[in-house]
């Protein structure tokens, strides 16, 4: 049998399905023994046709491999471009800065430092309003104003090891704009998305791949555990506190919410004061933001890292004027929307290449890939000759050499 033909047919969907049907599994690993292999029936064309099929498969796969390699090169280039856009955005190089525009137009502007002071005032006001509402709901009147002394001013954090920023920008700890972090709970659920009228719990994978995915939710069956205050709402900023080292800290803005789904213990909601969530999103996704998350995440195993709320608040980010945040975010969206379109096209074409590879193999073993030659030696004659050779030269197990002492 032609070696290339055997290798190709062994990789075909028909043979793979037969093997999986006869194989046994242990801990998710498929195992087949020699008897199973001997029972697998293979289509056997004439030897000359096997060679023609092998040549044609090789030719078409070479073209297909070149196409896949080209698509993956573009994919890698888009990944680098995405990173460069985010880097330029966080360094003030993507759009004219507010300082440049103000100087050109002869006007003043609110600097990042002034914005930070305003954020701290707003942060405290929101905290006090939230605490007063909680006491009201609990039926506890705030007679003693001493409860306000429980407010903790956010730490500034050390920034001397960070690079210089454009005029009008300032470094800030994430503790400044975050006035509250909300977390849900973990409990047993049905492993399927909730149906209409049911309530779900968000899984880590719902925030892993760039946008909020409502399909990645579990269904809560215990109505006593449903907490409407923990439901994801449109505009929520969601953050994954636990995942692999490359995925921990992934975050999304919940743009569209059509299902009832609660926060889990691993998916946090940030409540922000005077910070554009779009700006926070792009800074945390940038190289500098990812470096901060890796610096602060804990855990000994690469497969699972965690970043607690206290450490989240220590993340340092650049803070430009609020008008500049909006302009940068809009420009990043404009550029990355093109990237996402191209990435989607590449993903579609890679899937098409995978299907085409299987289609080539299927056609090959249905006798439709190359023309058949009536002058070829019939496969039945070839098979009879193979059986005769096997009967005349029965295989014998090789004798094992005895092991010597010290081997």
Where are these regions (language model features)?
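A short glycine-rich beta-alpha junction/loop motif
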Residues: 1-4, 14, 25-48, 259-268, ...
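Short, ligand-facing micro-motifs at secondary-structure edges
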Residues: 3-8, 17-23, 27, 188, ...
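Conserved catalytic core of Hanks-type protein kinase domains
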Residues: 9, 88, 241, 283, ...
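Amphipathic alpha-helix face/heptad-repeat signature
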Residues: 9, 53, 74, 266, ...
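Short, solvent-exposed loop/turn positions at domain surfaces
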Residues: 26, 225-226, 301, 344-347
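Non-catalytic DNA-recognition/assembly elements of restriction-modification systems
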Residues: 39, 43, 47-54, 62, ...
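Short amphipathic coiled-coil heptad-repeat segments
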Residues: 61-105, 113, 117, 121-153, ...
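Sequence-specific dsDNA recognition surfaces
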Residues: 153-160, 175-191, 205-237, 257, ...
């Amino acid at each position: 049998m032609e070696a290339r033909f055997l290798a190709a047919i062994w990789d075909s969907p028909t043979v793979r399905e037969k093997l999986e049907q006869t194989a046994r599994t242990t801990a998710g690993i498929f195992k087949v023994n020699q008897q199973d292999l001997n029972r697998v029936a293979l289509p056997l064309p004439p030897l000359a046709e096997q060679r023609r099929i092998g040549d044609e498969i090789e030719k078409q796969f070479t073209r297909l491999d070149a196409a896949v390699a080209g698509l993956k090169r573009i994919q890698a280039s888009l990944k680098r471009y995405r990173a460069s856009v985010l880097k330029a955005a966080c360094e003030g190089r993507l759009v004219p800065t507010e300082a440049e525009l103000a100087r050109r137009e002869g006007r003043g502007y609110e600097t990042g430092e002034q914005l930070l002071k305003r954020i701290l005032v707003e942060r405290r006001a929101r905290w006090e309003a939230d605490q007063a509402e909680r006491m009201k709901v609990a039926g506890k009147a705030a007679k003693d104003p001493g409860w306000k002394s429980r407010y903790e001013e956010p730490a500034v954090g050390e920034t001397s090891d960070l690079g210089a920023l454009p005029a009008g920008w300032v470094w800030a700890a994430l503790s400044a704009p975050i006035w509250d972090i909300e977390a849900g709970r973990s409990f047993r659920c049905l492993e399927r998305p909730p149906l209409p009228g049911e309530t779900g719990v968000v899984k880590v994978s719902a925030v892993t791949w760039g946008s909020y995915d409502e399909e990645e939710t579990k269904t809560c069956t215990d109505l006593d555990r449903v907490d409407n205050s923990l439901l994801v709402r449109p505009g929520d900023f969601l953050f994954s506190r636990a995942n692999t080292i490359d995925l921990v800290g992934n975050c999304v803005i919940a743009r569209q919410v059509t299902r009832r789904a609660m926060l889990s213990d691993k998916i946090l909601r940030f409540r922000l004061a005077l910070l554009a969530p779009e700006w926070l999103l792009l800074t945390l996704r940038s190289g500098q933001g990812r470096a901060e998350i890796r610096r602060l995440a804990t855990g000994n195993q690469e497969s699972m890292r965690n970043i607690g709320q206290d450490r989240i608040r220590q993340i340092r980010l650049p803070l430009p004027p609020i008008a500049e945040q909006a302009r940068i975010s809009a420009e990043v969206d404009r550029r990355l929307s093109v990237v996402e379109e191209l990435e989607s096209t590449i993903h579609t074409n890679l899937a098409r290449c995978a299907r085409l590879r299987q289609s080539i193999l299927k056609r090959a073993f249905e006798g439709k890939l190359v023309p058949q030659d009536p002058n070829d030696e019939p496969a039945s004659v070839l098979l009879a000759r193979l059986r005769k050779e096997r009967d005349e030269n029965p295989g014998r197990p090789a004798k094992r050499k005895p092991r010597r002492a010290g081997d």
